[in-house]
Design a protein with these regions (language model features):
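Acidic, glycine-enriched active-site microenvironments
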Residues: 1-292
């Protein structure tokens, strides 16, 4: 019996319908080969469609124009602008702030997370603590930065599985007095729940595992200026408690930015922690005006 041949399946790939955005060519000539932040603008002058950053603005923007998956954004774009920075660090910080402030249509949404939390050992057990209640820039003994309580407990559970820790002792599940937990029978718990190992041994492994997640306290008395330089451009990044207050051209201008940060900035911490502690930048300590 002959089988009727089916019509070939049409696959609408982005590449098949992609057209090079010729209408954006006038904006390409002046693109700098320097670090900074760039903007794809649509019809609205108030809000860009997309904000990006790169150590080479020109190269990165041109790569967008050759990417079929970004055809929708490119079709809506009408012009391209940019802001140069003194280096990659400045580009990272400026991009993160502008995306939060302007919420471009084609960027992943970045918002201040009111559920940001961490793990802290209190009374011998790890507890979930929140940035809204605890100053994460100065509180000692914080481990991990998590989007919400569920993510924090999931990380603790993953650590328990790796270290054969007891869910019951950690407070992740209830225990019946005098009886081993279910995971002990499966050899997934080393037995702190039933005396097979001491609580001290259990807690030592817990602390060892949490050490890799330690949140670094702000190591300076107050605000600092981080000097970033390239060619003929120098910026001083004014930072306090892992919060980027902005950048200025000279230290004399820093006073205008000095203020107490409005809470812990997760994105600022992620961007700044390693570069600041690595010692690769000149750091100038600043005084912060006292609150009146």
């Amino acid at each position: 019996v002959s089988r009727r041949q089916s019509a070939p399946r049409l696959e609408f790939e982005a590449a098949a319908i992609y057209e090079y955005p010729e209408h954006l060519r006038p904006w390409l000539e002046a693109l700098p080969k320097q670090p900074g932040v760039y903007f794809f603008h649509g019809e609205s002058d108030a809000m860009p469609l997309y904000i990006g950053k790169s150590i080479n603005i020109r190269s990165r923007v041109l790569s967008h124009l050759r990417t079929p998956d970004e055809a929708a954004m490119l079709r809506q774009s009408r012009r391209i602008t940019w802001m140069q920075t003194a280096g990659e660090l400045g580009a990272l910080l400026l991009e993160a702030r502008l995306i939060k402030e302007q919420q471009p249509l084609f960027n992943k949404r970045l918002r201040r997370n009111r559920q940001l939390c961490s793990l802290q050992i209190t009374g011998g057990k790890p507890q979930v603590v929140y940035a809204r209640d605890v100053d994460f820039s100065h509180a000692p003994g914080l481990h991990g930065l998590f989007a919400n309580r569920r993510a924090a407990l999931q990380a603790l559970q993953t650590l328990a599985d790796a270290q054969q820790l007891c869910y019951g002792v950690l407070g992740l599940e209830s225990l019946t007095r005098g009886r081993a937990c279910f995971r002990f029978a499966l050899k997934r718990c080393a037995g702190a729940c039933c005396g097979k190992e001491s609580i001290e041994q259990h807690d030592a492994r817990l602390k060892e595992g949490l050490a890799a997640l330690s949140v670094t306290c702000w190591p300076w008395q107050g605000a600092i200026a981080l000097k970033e330089t390239r060619d003929d451009m120098t910026h001083y990044h004014i930072i306090h408690n892992w919060f980027w207050l902005g950048a200025v051209d000279t230290l004399d201008d820093a006073t205008a930015l000095l203020r107490a940060p409005a809470g812990f900035d997760h994105d600022g911490y992620k961007i700044l922690c390693k570069p600041l502690l690595a010692g690769g930048y000149e750091i100038i300590e600043l005084s912060v005006p006292e609150a009146r």
